[in-house]
Amino acid sequence: MKRARPSEDTFNPVYPYDTETGPPTVPFLTPPFVSPNGFQESPPGVLSLRVSEPLDTSHGMLALKMGSGLTLDKAGNLTSQNVTTVTQPLKKTKSNISLDTSAPLTITSGALTVATTAPLIVTSGALSVQSQAPLTVQDSKLSIATKGPITVSDGKLALQTSAPLSGSDSDTLTVTASPPLTTATGSLGINMEDPIYVNNGKIGIKISGPLQVAQNSDTLTVVTGPGVTVEQNSLRTKVAGAIGYDSSNNMEIKTGGGMRINNNLLILDVDYPFDAQTKLRLKLGQGPLYINASHNLDINYNRGLYLFNASNNTKKLEVSIKKSSGLNFDNTAIAINAGKGLEFDTNTSESPDINPIKTKIGSGIDYNENGAMITKLGAGLSFDNSGAITIGNKNDDKLTLWTTPDPSPNCRIHSDNDCKFTLVLTKCGSQVLATVAALAVSGDLSSMTGTVASVSIFLRFDQNGVLMENSSLKKHYWNFRNGNSTNANPYTNAVGFMPNLLAYPKTQSQTAKNNIVSQVYLHGDKTKPMILTITLNGTSESTETSEVSTYSMSFTWSWESGKYTTETFATNSYTFSYIAQE
């Protein structure tokens, strides 16, 4: 008969070892009835021992796993290769090491501790003393904190005293008293006479009017009547109005304008036009003031003045003006009523209160240094000898920017001032008319070799159209026209002469529109042609300088290599035009 199958986690010693469902997994011969303790079926159908660390099987036998320091002796006993010796307070009993302790040391929960009683306590792993004021721990020593009058003297507590307290020979604290204090009765008392008395153990003062004791503050006060007051804790006479005190606290009469004290008499002090010999009266001169029949001060007035009735039923003297003649009132002052074309000058250097009338001007009109009206002239306009407006002025020509018609050596091609470069720019509305020519005066271009096949001149301008230092042309040779020379003062703006940035954009590569290409001739000889390329707002200059321009012009003359040897570089004049920036 089969037994009930145990749970899956227990060993079933009854054959067969099959599951509750399904056929037997392995054949079996006889059912070995064995204890499940220490046995297991692993793998299925095989009876084996159930072992755990440090037990193991080795060569079919049960064996013991051993770590470092353990071994088996010849008798098969487990031994340790490390022999431990100890010294007191440690002791060894068989395989155990223990610690001998005595009070106050003890072992609690396997740890060595110190048994303590108050005021000792273990805090944060350290033995300390609990203390309450006045006991304290200072410099790792228990001490007593003191505060005056208690102090420590010669390692003993002592009492500091000062008069009237003192220590007697019997080491007692006594009080030294002087009149009116007394200690005759063994207690501190006061000797007193009237008006001081004692009532219910309290000192009081016998008083009568005008003295009284204020009920709310128990302070002695003085009752004051009319004309008397207490001020800054002092009893004094109450004064008001013109009565006061002098520097010696004497009562006096204060006097103001028109009054003074002389020989302890109050005197009316007057000045002209008043007189006070016997009575106060007004002195009148020969002016318009007079005393009328009603004994009132009145005024005589003539033409240009009149009296008018004010809103408060008073009469006021006013100037009579004729508004139709250009006069008017400005608040309380007479003013000129300026019409169209006239105004008042507020920018006068004479005085900020002086505003002369002047002609009101608009665009195109100004004042000269003499204050006369003149016409404002823009660029290209001037006055001729007759004073008429004319176009152009050769002595101050703001329509021509040039090098002069015949400049000195002013340009660098290969070396400083090795070339005379002529360039004239004339503003013609939205166009600029230009003439250019170049002549070598020194260096290798004064006698060219066969290796030279081109000459380039670069002009670079900043955002204001001012020639930059990194140009081939020297700055001081380039300015507005003044006769056959240039202005002495450097110019600051010539944007109107610059190539238009929309028409000739500064791009990474030159475009066809940026270039003006034509044929010119060496020395003006038609048998010696050269190609002139004028580039407007080109970018080739950025490879030669770190300072980038806003506008630029470059002029390049080129010819076949090997030609014109020993010749001097000199070009004929070439005229061209371009669209202006402004």
Curated annotation (Swiss-Prot):
Function field: Forms spikes that protrude from each vertex of the icosahedral capsid. Interacts with host coxsackievirus and adenovirus receptor CXADR located at the cell tight junctions to provide virion initial attachment to target cell. The fiber protein binds to CXADR with a higher affinity than CXADR binds to itself, thereby blocking the cell-cell adhesion function of CXADR dimers and leading to local disruption of the tight junction. Fiber protein present on neo-synthesized particles may thus disrupt the junctional integrity in order to facilitate further neighboring cells infection.
Q: How is it modified after translation?
A: O-glycosylated; glycans contain N-acetylglucosamine and may play a role in fiber assembly and stabilization.
Residue numbers spanned by region Tail (penton base attachment): 1-44
> What are the start and end residues of every segment in region (Head)?
399-582
What subcellular compartments does it reside in? Virion; Host nucleus
Classify the main location: virion
Task: Enumerate the Shaft repeat regions by residue range.
Answer: 45-59, 60-75, 76-95, 96-109, 110-124, 125-139, 140-154, 155-170, 171-185, 186-200, 201-217, 218-232, 233-248, 249-263, 264-277, 278-294, 295-314, 315-331, 332-354, 355-370, 371-386, 387-392
Annotated GO biological process: adhesion receptor-mediated virion attachment to host cell; cell adhesion; symbiont entry into host cell
For this entry, the protein name equals Fiber protein
Annotated stretches, region: Shaft region:
45-392
As stated in the Swiss-Prot or TrEMBL entry, residues carrying the post-translational modification Phosphoserine are S325, S351
Organism for this UniProt entry: Human adenovirus C serotype 2 (HAdV-2)
Tell me, how does this one assemble? Homotrimer; arranged in a triple beta-spiral. Interacts with host receptor CXADR. Interacts (via N-terminal tail region) with pentons.
* Comment on protein domains: The tail region anchors the fiber to penton base capsomers, whereas the shaft, built from several repeated motifs, allows the knob to protrude from the virion.
Organism lineage string: Viruses, Varidnaviria, Bamfordvirae, Preplasmiviricota, Tectiliviricetes
Q: Which residues cross the membrane?
A: none
Cite any additional comment in the entry.
All late proteins expressed from the major late promoter are produced by alternative splicing and alternative polyadenylation of the same gene giving rise to non-overlapping ORFs. A leader sequence is present in the N-terminus of all these mRNAs and is recognized by the viral shutoff protein to provide expression although conventional translation via ribosome scanning from the cap has been shut off in the host cell.
